[in-house]
């Protein structure tokens, strides 16, 4: 009888159900269900339809029954920072806002009136981003204070879905850490900070580590999907799950979780909370088994995704890589952090205008456009590596690139050249794999994180890129 585990991995633009099993000591993956996701525009607000998302979770579970592949457990990961407030009857209070909604505009100034930004970073080790939950809750306090008064529980979105499946409310640590309300020394909510900000402290449940059992399915869910299983906590912040799947078996290395955004950093047993780290905008997010993900959020592949989209998705990412390499002599450079690239109506025009404005040759072909972007991305990776090593006080000899961007061979080679380090690329499905690893360790099928990573290295193709001499 084959033993299946189910990873439900929900990103901001799509979600999928992936079944995993161990076959001769190797992890086998099978995607069985996929669905669209996105924030809904409603009355000028950007909202998540959590009922629809929960319906998709259940629909994917039914697919397991159809296929005759019943998992022993499941875990859910999503993006960070978004949450629901539940009343005494466990109903959601108000709307479920998406992190891109503008209600947090100016909320950093409101929080800073109570607590300076340097003090907030010193307490939590989390980089300031205007969509962090700490600012979202300040928006609630300012705009709809009655919701905070009526709230009995705050649950991050994956924890809310776990509650809907099992009837049990648990709060998971890695995603909790992204709220900017967690004490990195205790791995629990910073109740003093929460009180100081005027948020009700009793709505925050004790934080639990990945690998904790949430519960069995509620009878009505069992009836609907046709089976029972155990719901388990994974690193429910998707990046925490992805970093679990970094196939680093010994020594220290830098990782890049490469997708729409690139998250570049190291794993540490202690948070790095210094003035230099704060100035360079590095964050200390929670990781598996009391680890920290000391990382920086940098522009990822979304400039490439935008260019591809403007050409009606006519080229695959592999083709774009090849075309960029063919145009590698094209000399122009752009600054990826320039405001003009944040959300332009046309990324192609934004790149061309930047080159024109700065007196450089203007890229015309797709290859020239993508060449400009890939090289500047590699350059920003190089700068981030140098900053990271300076702050950490040590050098690293390798970089592991995981996630969808690990398939961009040309970018991987440019990254090796720009950093002077050996690059190991893969696996591409890192988030779902990390989700499954937490379940497999919980079940005793894998001994610990070290053996889980060894298993990843042996299960998936990892490509090596050496820096040019």
What name fits each language-model region?
Residues 101:
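Carbohydrate-associated surface elements
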Residues 11-13, 72, 77-79, 133, ...:
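Short, basic and Ser/Thr-rich N-terminal targeting/leader segments
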Residues 191, 197-212, 436:
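A conserved helix-loop-beta module that forms one wall/lid of the active-site cleft
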Residues 62, 66-98, 127-131, 162-183, ...:
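Short beta-strand-loop/turn "lid" adjacent to the catalytic site in phosphate-handling enzymes
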Residues 84, 106-110, 242-244:
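Pocket-flanking alpha-helical
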Residues 1-94, 122, 222-231, 419-421, ...:
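N-terminal glycine/serine-rich phosphate-binding loop of ATP-dependent small-molecule kinases
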Residues 2, 6-7, 19, 112-125, ...:
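Active-site core segments that coordinate phosphate-bearing ligands/cofactors
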Residues 70-78, 153, 206, 394-403:
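Short glycine-rich phosphate-binding loop at a beta-alpha junction
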């Amino acid at each position: 009888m084959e033993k299946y585990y189910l990873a439900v991995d929900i990103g901001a633009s799509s979600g999928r159900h992936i079944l995993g099993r161990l076959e001769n000591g190797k992890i086998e993956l099978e995607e069985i269900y996929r669905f669209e996701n996105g924030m809904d525009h409603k009355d000028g607000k950007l909202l998540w339809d959590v009922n629809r998302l929960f319906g998709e979770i259940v629909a994917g579970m039914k697919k397991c029954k159809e296929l005759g592949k019943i998992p022993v457990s499941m875990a859910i990961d999503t993006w960070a920072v978004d949450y629901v407030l539940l009343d005494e009857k466990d109903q959601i209070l108000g709307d479920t806002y998406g992190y891109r909604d503008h209600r947090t505009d100016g909320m950093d100034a409101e929080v800073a009136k109570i607590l300076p930004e340097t003090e907030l970073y010193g307490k939590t080790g989390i980089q300031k981003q205007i969509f962090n939950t700490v600012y979202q809750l300040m928006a609630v306090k300012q705009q709809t204070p009655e919701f905070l008064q009526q709230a009995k529980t705050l649950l991050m979105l994956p924890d809310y879905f776990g509650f809907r499946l099992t009837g049990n409310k648990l709060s998971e640590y890695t995603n909790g850490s992204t709220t900017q309300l967690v004490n990195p020394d205790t791995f629990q909510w910073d109740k003093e900070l929460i009180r100081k900000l005027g948020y009700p402290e009793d709505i925050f449940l004790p934080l639990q580590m990945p690998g904790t059992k949430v519960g069995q399915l509620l009878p009505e869910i069992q009836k609907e999907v046709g089976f029972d299983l155990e719901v388990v906590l994974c690193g429910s912040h998707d990046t925490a799950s992805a970093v679990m799947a970094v196939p680093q078996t010994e020594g220290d290395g830098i990782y890049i979780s490469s997708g729409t955004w690139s998250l570049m950093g190291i794993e540490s047993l202690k948070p790095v909370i210094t003035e230099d780290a704060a100035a360079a905008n590095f964050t200390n997010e929670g990781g598996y088994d009391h680890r920290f993900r000391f990382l920086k959020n940098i522009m990822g592949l979304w400039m490439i995704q935008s260019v591809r989209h403007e050409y009606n998705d006519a080229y695959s990412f592999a083709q774009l890589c090849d075309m960029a390499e063919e145009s590698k002599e094209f000399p122009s450079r752009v600054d990826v952090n320039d405001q003009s690239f944040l959300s332009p109506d046309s990324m192609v025009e934004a790149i061309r205008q930047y080159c024109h404005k700065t007196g450089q040759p203007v890229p015309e072909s797709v290859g020239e456009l993508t060449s400009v972007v890939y090289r500047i991305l590699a350059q920003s990776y190089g700068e981030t590596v140098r900053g990271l090593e300076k702050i950490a006080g040590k050098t690293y000899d390798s970089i592991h690139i995981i996630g969808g961007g690990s398939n961009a061979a040309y970018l991987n080679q440019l990254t090796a050249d720009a950093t002077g380090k050996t690059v190991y690329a893969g696996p591409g499905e890192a988030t779902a794999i990390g989700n499954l690893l937490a379940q497999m360790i919980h079940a005793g099928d894998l001994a610990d994180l070290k053996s889980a990573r060894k298993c990843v290295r042996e299960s998936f193709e990892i490509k090596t890129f050496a820096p040019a001499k």
